[in-house]
Amino acid sequence: MHIYSVNDPEFKSYGNVWDDVPSELTSPVLEALSATPIPEGSKYVASAPELEGVKDADKLGFLMFGGRPFQLGWCNGHNTRLNCLEYHRASEFNLGARDFILLVAHRWEIEDGKLDTACVKAFCVPAGKVVEVFNTTLHYPPCMVDDGGFQVMVALPAGTNGPRPEAATDMPTAGDSYCYWKADKWVLCHADSPKAAEGGYVGLIGKNLDIACD
């Protein structure tokens, strides 16, 4: 599988690289992020006090979300497989303490509730780069560049990826409700993924990509 750089023109329809974010805004987050654990598998913390409490976190959040309430969390671990793809109603921002790889596709490539994994592209994100992932971009937990794993800040509007609301039991069957999973989280699963076994909507067809061997 070819791995592009987020600096390549191929990334432009998936997101933006914010090269001009002052280091005084990113360095405190990176220092705190570097101290978070890197487990086997992957772990996601939606709202992490150790990141949200650093100097000027409020300024970084305002820069990204323009005054909307936001959350700074992290996704760390070891992973090489696609498994699922998700999207939100707003952009997501990532910042890695280590290099990492994003597997992405476009929402408009979904046809009749299905997406062929042949559409998925891989992009390497250098450590220390702020990357905006558009709300029209399907994504999921990162993949690792090496055996050291990944440590990635995940910034989103507050409440995103939160518990599934009780109101979801009465959600109308319309639009993209078929793949709704949690608060502001819509997910397409591969049949071979753990989330599919939990009842997630199986919407990825084709190979469950693995960057270690594909």
Which residue ranges define each predicted feature?
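Active-site region of the double-stranded beta-helix
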Residues: 1-127, 138-214
